[in-house]
């Protein structure tokens, strides 16, 4: 007994240490109750998962103990029959072992993928597929060794309990999800059935069938391979008791299969059938009746096996099952060819209408406000006056060139990294009713970029603990050398905060709107190891010339490790014994865990799907609740987007072949303190049934979006990832008439443009513009659209970002009877212009490279303005400099060093004086400056 206790001690210590660290980590947010609920749910479902395992063990023990004489009237099982029994039971044993072990691995690594592991064709990760030979080898050897086979059976029992326990989110969602109030027309179920309940029922039935099949196969194989049956290749017929007991096992499995077949009727609702997303005429009138009949026959077959055993009636029912499958497989293509195809539109129109309506609802396209506009042919002075707010914020700097410049001018040390640049708006001009568009980029510490000799344990976890600062540059201007004009740059005591005379921005207004001092970033986008702070070791804060400035963390984040017990738990949790031996730890030391923002959120809310990169905001104010860090006010926060999604939403079309989502909501905005690591989760889609379920389960975790501080709410952005999905679905589902949808003659596409010599799709971009009917300008996310296989501009979709109208979608249709030039056509006109082409050719060569930036289509008054920035950089690692702006109104083209000058040329219709004042010497000088 003592020996057993010593063996048990290490795993118990590991479990206790992990539970302690997790509990304390959740306690820093006052969310211990969330962790406790999750533990209790997993314990509850582990108990529920143990019930079928316990019943299977009882059944196996009872079957193995039966020693009744063979039935004399039955002939022995030999020859081909023996081979068939041996092959079927062996293959079933192997297949169930592999699937159950794969599910256990998936449950351990990605438990929230269990809900769609099969219904959406979930494929195991490649590293798990590499385990297949090992799994087959172990299961194969166990077939030959009874003792090993029993251990495999025990392992499969644990695997089943693990899967059921780790799938707590699947079962909880199914139990708590409210009705949406909308019903699908085929089976009459509420649409919430597909969002939550279907996956849970399917997973439960699949696990029961897998475990039942494994148990039955294990029992049959054990009986068949008992000596001397295998050597004789024959065995006597089973006795009456054994036969009845085996019939009960087979019948139970058949009941599970019947349930899966009955449930598969719902799968017709979210499988694409030709043009119809969901069940069409053929599925309703042929597939559905056959599946219902098949489920009924399997149900009768299963019940009869349990009640009467396997006999002539059961064999007849089995033949009926085969006949139903064959008849359906034969009739389906015949009916499609002879009945549906000749009158497809008439038969499918009601189903197409349902699919259009459901797809639009699944991706919130039904919220779109649609308007029609007819832009003027020429850009006029009146347009410039009414569109002044738009022209003041035209984005001339793309993220790519700006990040390149940041990395060369602002990283300052090899271990700093600018991984993302986000477009945002800040009130930098107090008297203006329009916020200034800027690009903000965080300077994070990249541990992987440390020199090899510097990658010591102490450096990685005690010294290089955080990034520092950020850059802010207006989107619509450049410096005298063509480089970005920063209003905030550099870091630490050398942080430069500047105004911009051309834009009317004053330094004091920048300081008031964007706090930049003490901007230590302990939590960020980049993966970071744990950090131990504060300690006896000085933390690197920032470089100051040739010297380094050091600091100590003064926040409240982290798990305390001041006492010996706390250090022991942390060292076990992190598998790091050096935490016990180092002398750098002091009484108030803590270990910062999960410092990557998305990892941090997933630990708290694993049911949220996090897409896209979090973006940094820096805001004034000392009453943000989650922003206080000891005696220090923290102003930098990360905002991340949390989604709820489903691949089983009735009659909704999937996004693509690789993205099976049929329902998507940007339901949660997560704000993370960049210094203190505190988090708040704000519900931005309170009507979403899925997020309602999680609010019921964890009410302490969520807040309404109305409770978000206004200073943060002013920086909310419609996420580009969500917007792109909506644009993708809109390309076909902007049509609401089934006849037009069926004809396919009004399909849209995202236009193409040439960027850096490569043809790419036009990305969504932000503009500040005044919507018709509004008195003030708004911050919009815009996507131009063109007809399929035609370059003319047909529409654009705009997402509104400002608080009052946040998330509203506006679709602007352009006239079909007059061609409006699209981005691809305008770019072709620019490149074909002889004067422009001459200048471009002059720059693009001799060690320099010309890059035509993103072409923007902007509403200016009642006209359209096309704007394309032009960058010049050295071929090998040069700084991209903004050298020219090309503009067009669809008729004329003009180019100059800044936007206002280029527009002035366009309005005055100056005959292509685009090289005026730009001598070859100046071009050479620009090239040299870029190269240097």
From Swiss-Prot:
One of its GO terms (cellular component) is extracellular region. HAMAP family: UPF0182. The lineage of its organism: Bacteria, Bacillati, Cyanobacteriota, Cyanophyceae, Synechococcales. The chain crosses the membrane at residues 4-24, 40-60, 85-105, 124-144, 151-171, 201-221, 243-263, 293-313, 315-335. It comes from the Bacteria. Pfam families: UPF0182. InterPro entries: UPF0182 (IPR005372). Coiled coil: none annotated. Belongs to the UPF0182 family. It is a multi-pass membrane protein. This is UPF0182 protein Syncc9902_1151.
């Amino acid at each position: 007994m003592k020996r057993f206790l010593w063996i048990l001690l290490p795993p118990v210590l590991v479990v206790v240490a992990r539970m302690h660290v997790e509990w304390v980590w959740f306690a820093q947010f006052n969310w211990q109750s969330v962790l406790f609920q999750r533990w209790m749910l997993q314990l509850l479902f582990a108990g529920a998962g143990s019930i079928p395992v316990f019943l299977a063990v009882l059944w196996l023990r009872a079957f193995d103990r039966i020693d009744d004489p063979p039935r004399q009237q039955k002939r022995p099982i030999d020859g081909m029959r023996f081979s068939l029994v041996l092959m079927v039971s062996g293959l079933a044993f192997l297949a169930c072992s592999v699937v159950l072990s794969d599910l256990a691995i998936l449950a351990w690594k990605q438990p929230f993928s269990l809900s769609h592991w099969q219904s959406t064709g979930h494929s195991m990760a490649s590293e798990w597929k590499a385990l297949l030979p090992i799994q087959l080898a172990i299961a194969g050897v166990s077939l030959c060794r009874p003792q090993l086979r029993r251990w495999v059976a025990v392992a499969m029992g644990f695997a089943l309990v693990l899967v059921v326990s780790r799938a707590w989110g699947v079962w909880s969602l199914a139990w708590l999800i409210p009705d949406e109030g909308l019903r699908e027309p085929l089976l009459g179920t509420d649409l919430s059935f597909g969002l939550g309940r279907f996956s849970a029922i399917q997973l439960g039935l699949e696990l029961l069938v897998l475990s039942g099949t494994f148990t039955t196969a294990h029992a049959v194989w054990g009986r068949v391979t008992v000596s001397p049956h295998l050597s004789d290749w024959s065995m006597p017929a089973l006795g009456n008791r054994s036969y009845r007991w085996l019939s009960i096992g087979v019948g139970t499995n058949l009941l599970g299969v019947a349930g899966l077949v009955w449930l598969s009727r719902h799968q017709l609702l979210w499988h694409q059938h030709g043009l119809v997303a969901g069940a069409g005429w053929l599925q309703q009138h042929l597939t559905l009746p056959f599946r219902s009949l098949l489920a009924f026959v399997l149900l009768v077959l299963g019940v009869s096996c349990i009640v009467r055993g396997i006999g002539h009636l059961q064999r007849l029912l089995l033949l009926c099952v085969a006949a139903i499958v064959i008849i359906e497989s034969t009739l389906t293509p015949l009916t499609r060819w002879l009945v549906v195809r000749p009158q497809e539109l008439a038969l499918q129109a009601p189903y197409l209408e349902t699919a259009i309506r459901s797809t639009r609802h699944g991706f919130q396209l039904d919220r779109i406000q649609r308007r029609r506009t007819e832009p003027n042919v020429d850009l006029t002075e009146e347009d410039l006056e009414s569109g002044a707010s738009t022209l003041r914020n035209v984005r001339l700097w793309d993220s790519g060139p700006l990040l390149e410049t940041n990395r060369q001018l602002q990283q300052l040390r090899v271990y700093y990294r600018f991984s993302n640049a986000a477009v945002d708006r800040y009130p930098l001009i107090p008297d203006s009713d329009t916020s200034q568009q800027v690009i903000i980029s965080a300077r994070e510490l990249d541990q992987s970029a440390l020199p090899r000799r510097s990658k010591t344990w102490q450096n990685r976890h005690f010294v290089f603990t955080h990034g520092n600062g950020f850059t802010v540059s207006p989107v619509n201007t450049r410096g005298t050398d063509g480089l970005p004009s920063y209003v905030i740059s550099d870091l630490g005591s050398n942080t430069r905060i500047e105004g911009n005379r051309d834009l009317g921005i004053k330094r004091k207004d920048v300081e008031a709107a964007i706090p930049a001092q003490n901007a230590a970033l302990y939590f960020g986008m980049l993966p970071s190891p744990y950090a131990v702070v504060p300690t006896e070791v000085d933390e690197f804060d920032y470089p100051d010339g040739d010297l380094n400035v050091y600091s100590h963390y003064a926040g409240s984040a982290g798990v305390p490790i001041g006492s010996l017990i706390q250090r022991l738990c942390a060292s076990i949790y992190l598998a790091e014994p050096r935490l016990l031996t180092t002398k750098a730890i002091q009484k108030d030391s803590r270990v910062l865990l999960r410092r990557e923002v998305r990892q941090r959120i997933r630990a708290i809310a694993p049911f949220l799907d996090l897409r896209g990169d979090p973006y940094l905001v820096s805001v004034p104010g000392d009453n943000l609740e989650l922003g206080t860090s000891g005696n220090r006010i923290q102003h930098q926060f990360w905002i991340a987007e949390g989604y709820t999604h489903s691949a089983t939403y009735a009659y909704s079309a999937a996004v693509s072949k690789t993205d099976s989502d049929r329902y998507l909501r940007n339901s949660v905005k997560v704000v993370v303190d960049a210094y203190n690591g505190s988090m708040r989760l704000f519900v931005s889609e309170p009507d979403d049934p899925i997020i309602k379920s999680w609010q019921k389960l964890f009410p302490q975790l969520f807040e309404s979006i109305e409770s978000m501080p206004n200073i943060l709410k002013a920086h909310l952005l419609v996420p580009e990832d969500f917007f792109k999905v909506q644009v993708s679905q809109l390309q076909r589902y902007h049509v609401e008439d089934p006849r037009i949808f069926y004809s396919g003659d009004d399909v849209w596409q995202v236009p193409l443009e040439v960027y850096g010599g490569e043809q790419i799709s036009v990305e969504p971009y932000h503009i500040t513009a005044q919507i018709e009917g509004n008195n003030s300008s708004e911050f919009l996310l815009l996507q131009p659209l063109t007809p399929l296989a035609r370059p003319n501009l047909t529409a654009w979709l705009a997402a509104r970002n400002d608080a009052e109208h946040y998330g509203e979608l506006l679709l602007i249709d352009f006239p079909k009877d007059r061609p409006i030039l699209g981005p691809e056509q305008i770019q072709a006109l620019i490149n074909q212009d002889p004067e422009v082409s001459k200048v471009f050719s002059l720059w693009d060569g001799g060690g320099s490279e010309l890059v035509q930036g993103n072409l923007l289509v902007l509403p200016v008054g009642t006209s359209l303005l096309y704007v394309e920035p032009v960058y010049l950089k050295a071929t090998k690692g040069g700084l991209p400099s903004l050298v020219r702006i090309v503009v067009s109104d669809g008729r004329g083209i003009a180019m100059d060093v800044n936007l206002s000058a280029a527009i002035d040329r366009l309005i005055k219709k100056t005959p292509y004086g685009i090289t005026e004042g730009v001598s070859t010497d100046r071009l050479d000088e620009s090239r040299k400056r870029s190269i240097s």
